[in-house]
Amino acid sequence: MSEVKYSKEHEWIKLDGDTAVVGITQHATEMLGDIVFVELPEIGSSVVKDGNAGVVESTKAASDIYTPVSGEIIENNQAIVDDPAKVNSDPENEAWFFKLKITDKSEMDSLMNKEEYEKFSKESGS
């Protein structure tokens, strides 16, 4: 079964073996508003936990996308680059940002489960 975890920067990550899918949360899209541009990391690039892995721009603001764990980018979701509005309609499923091969699964331990993330989002107001 795939496990979904959440970061304090409002990214979600779904683990499947040693690969993971990363995107932004529904809460993030609500804060950003209508998404108009997405920039994703290059396939084959290495990313580090909490490092910048792209940009999402909305009618309200531009925000960096951070990777919740370290790894190598193995796939990008070109569909959201071509049509950024898809991120608003289904941010936690079809509008994933990138897939990566994880180099250190223990980094998942510092992330939140759904209940913890919902509490964090409510309490932080961010």
UniProtKB/Swiss-Prot annotation:
The keyword NADP does not apply. The modification N6-lipoyllysine is found at residue 60. Keywords: Lipoyl. Residues 19-101 form the Lipoyl-binding domain. InterPro entries: 2-oxoA_DH_lipoyl-BS, GCV_H, GCV_H/Fam206, GCV_H_sub, Single_hybrid_motif. GO terms for cellular component: cytosol; glycine cleavage complex. Its cofactor is (R)-lipoate. Belongs to the GcvH family. This is Glycine cleavage system H protein. It comes from Pelagibacter ubique (strain HTCC1062). The gene is gcvH.
